[in-house]
Regions:
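Glycine-rich phosphate/adenosyl-contacting loop at the front of the ribokinase-like
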Residues: 1-78
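Conserved N-terminal subdomain of the carbohydrate kinase-like
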Residues: 34-55, 69-124
Length: 124
């Protein structure tokens, strides 16, 4: 089967919290989803810089195309990435997953999603 998807190219940055206290410190409610600006993202990631982190390509369409590829289907992804290191990571990760990628590259930053994972597994 040949399938191509068009979607948002987002890199998921997963941070494992030692406890939930840090959420109060940075003013975020546990389990909430908030759209934040670049400055807020940098402040959060700076505050949590010492925590273990994992980076993975994300976005629902990309995740579906990667899953299809892992099941043996020919899949492709169309999206927009920035001309930055995170965009390069995204492109490389899709290639390694066997997903043909077709990107529009801009001078801006690649989109990202910061996910803080509490010890009980809840995502914020």
């Amino acid at each position: 089967m040949n399938t191509i998807g068009l979607g948002n190219a987002l890199v998921d940055v997963l941070l494992r919290l030692e406890n939930d206290d840090v959420l109060s410190e940075i003013g975020i409610q546990k389990g909430a989803m908030d759209m934040i600006n670049r400055e807020q993202m940098i402040a959060i990631r700076t505050t949590l810089a010492g925590l273990p982190r994992t980076q993975t390509p994300g976005g629902s369409v990309c995740n579906t195309m990667r899953s299809m590829s892992s099941l043996g289907a020919n899949s492709g992804f169309i999206g927009k990435i920035g001309d930055d290191s995170i965009g390069g990571f995204y492109e490389d990760a899709l290639e390694k997953a066997g997903v043909s990628s077709y990107f529009i590259k801009t001078d801006g930053l690649t989109g990202s999603c910061t996910v803080m994972i509490s010890p009980d597994g809840e995502r914020t």
